[in-house]
A protein has these predicted regions:
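Terminal, low-structured helical/coil segments at or just beyond the last alpha-helical repeat
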Residues: 29, 318-326, 330, 489-520
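Short helix-capping/linker turns of helical repeat alpha-solenoids
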Residues: 50-53, 66-68, 73, 86-90, ...
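Bacterial N-terminal signal peptides
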Residues: 8-17
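N-terminal leader/linker segments that initiate helical-solenoid repeat arrays
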Residues: 21-62, 121, 322, 326-330, ...
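Hydrophobic face of amphipathic alpha-helices that form TPR/SEL1-like repeat modules
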Residues: 59-66, 95-102, 131-135, 147-154, ...
Length: 520
């Protein structure tokens, strides 16, 4: 059995030296003839190996691998190394790793080889790292570079050393490894080496890595490390945004909101910011401003997203509330505080009337909600229905959600009207009201008032979850969808992780937190 050249190169570095046990055996038999001494020492090693001596098992594996003292046999070598490794012998584990790396005695498996090398290093095999450093220096081995990169990055057998990490990242990056190209580019960007960062982001972007596409666009848009080109930069960031990358969605939304490098377009800004807002505080903040300052203000959604972004934007909120041009928003929040925290419905209605006069349809919606509240001593559901209808005419989508509940129960109505209730619920869900999406999803899930449709239910639940407002029943039903692998779900590959997240899911309470933080 012949060994290939790469195996010979590796063996010269990786195999453990003859054990001290063998040297001692030879010494002990030094008075006997040389041939007999060698034969006896081999038999002693075999005997010890058969009795379970891990060092002897490793040594016997070395002999079978190299053909020294025995007939060469990779598979038998691996069997002995496996026995040694089972007893946590670091040399045996390291030699097993070599077999998996080269495919000698077993099917080649780089992942298993990498795992075994790291295990051997952790258990004290100090020779592996310098051996692989020499291999990289001599041949530029991609496998060895990856092993060393991981070791220096995570402190496996060595102290963490980010400079060395970058050295081995570059070896991998030059070989065409897209993840290494991206990681190296990010490292360069963080250390203000924008030109080199741009080079490697571009290489990774060519291979379709969405994060690299985003960063390449970001650098072009801002002229970092490359000549500034806002149009091309925005096009690349948009490409990444369409691949559901929140950072890209935020930057594209911001550009449209501010008219930076492109014509100002609030509708497009809302689209991109809305896709990112559930995961990106800056996107949530800007989305709130879009709803607040749009041609037709939507105070319901503006408040929802501004409250989501409140932590980290305290100064921005204080500045917003101090702005005399934002009196409508100020009064709306003050009214919500009276409604939710103080249960002072009379004071709340007064503030919501002020909001109405300033052009906010949600002021009418919240007047109705205050009048319909079960704790309001002056409760008037008929008047509430009338106000909800008026609010809808003024453009309040939230009013459709509240009014649908009244049609469903018949409160304030002459009779129950489930058909109209469903119509209004759909209107609210399509308008971005998360709790309407939850409720409509529950209906599709249960087949209540609509034909049962798990796919439609899952779509609605995902929309509500993106706003951090999934109800407990919706979360439970979404778990059911993941357990059964419905294709509409975008991340089925991570179904187990998603199920665990959903089991612990708690809807956002950001609005109440914001209201509690407001000064009188």
């Amino acid at each position: 059995m012949k060994m290939n050249l790469s195996a010979i190169l590796f063996l010269s570095l990786a195999l453990s030296p003859l054990s001290s046990m063998e040297a001692a055996s030879v010494t002990n038999l030094s008075l006997a003839p040389k041939v007999k001494a060698k034969k006896d020492s081999v038999e002693i090693v075999k005997e010890k190996a058969n009795k379970g001596d891990a060092v002897a098992q490793n040594q016997l594996g070395v002999w079978y691998y190299t053909g020294k003292n025995v007939k060469q046999d990779y598979k038998v070598a691996l069997d002995w190394w496996a026995k040694s490794a089972k007893q946590n012998n670091p040399d045996g584990i390291g030699n097993m790793a070599m077999c998996y790396q080269l495919g000698n005695g077993i099917k080649k498996d780089s992942v298993m080889a990498m795992t075994l090398y790291k295990s051997a290093i952790k258990k004290g095999n100090a020779s592996i790292i310098p051996q692989h450093e020499k291999i990289v220096k001599n041949s530029g081995s991609v496998f060895s570079a990856r092993l060393l990169m991981d070791c220096y990055q995570n402190g496996i057998g060595v102290k963490r050393d980010l400079k060395k990490v970058e050295i081995y990242q570059e070896v991998l990056a030059k070989s065409g490894d897209v993840d290494a190209q991206f990681a190296l580019a990010l490292s360069c960007l963080n250390s203000k080496r924008s030109e080199k960062a741009a080079k490697y982001f571009a290489l990774a972007a060519k291979k379709g890595k969405k994060e690299a596409i985003y960063y390449q666009g970001f650098l072009l848009f801002n002229g970092m490390g490359v000549e500034q080109d806002k149009a091309k930069g925005l096009a690349l960031m948009t490409q990444a945004a369409e691949k559901n990358l929140p950072a890209a969605q935020y930057q594209v939304g911001r550009a449209y909101y501010e008219g930076d490098g492109v014509a100002k377009d609030i509708a497009k800004a809302q689209r991109y910011l809305g896709a990112a807002a559930g995961k990106n505080k800056n996107a949530a903040w800007m989305l709130g401003l879009c709803y607040l300052n749009g041609q037709t203000p939507n105070l319901y959604l503006a408040t929802q997203w501004i409250s989501e972004a409140a932590k980290g934007h305290e100064k921005d909120i204080n500045a917003l509330l101090a702005d005399s041009k934002q009196k409508m928003f100020y009064d709306y929040l003050a009214g919500l505080k009276k409604f939710y925290l103080d249960k002072d419905f009379e004071a709340a209605i007064k503030l919501f009337k002020s909001v109405e006069k300033l052009g906010g349809a949600e002021g009418i919606t919240m007047q109705a909600t205050s009048m319909a509240h079960k704790d309001n001593k002056k409760r008037n559901t008929k008047k509430a229905v009338s106000l909800y209808q008026k609010a809808m005419e003024k453009g309040s989508v939230a009013a459709a959600y509240y009014l649908s509940s009244m049609y469903e129960t018949g409160e304030g109505m002459k009779t129950v009207n489930k058909e109209q209730a469903l119509k209004l619920l759909k209107k609210a869900a399509n308008g971005g009201i998360a709790y309407a999406q939850d409720k409509l999803g529950d209906k599709y899930f249960a087949g209540e008032d609509v034909a049962r449709d798990y796919t439609e239910a899952a779509k609605l639940y995902l929309q509500a979850e993106a706003q951090n407002r999934l109800t407990s029943s919706a979360a439970k039903n979404l778990i059911y969808c993941y357990e059964r692998g419905f294709k509409v779900l975008p991340d089925l590959a991570n179904a187990k992780q998603r199920i665990e997240v959903l089991k612990k899911y708690k809807p956002s309470n950001s609005l109440i937190d914001l209201l509690k933080s407001l000064e009188e």
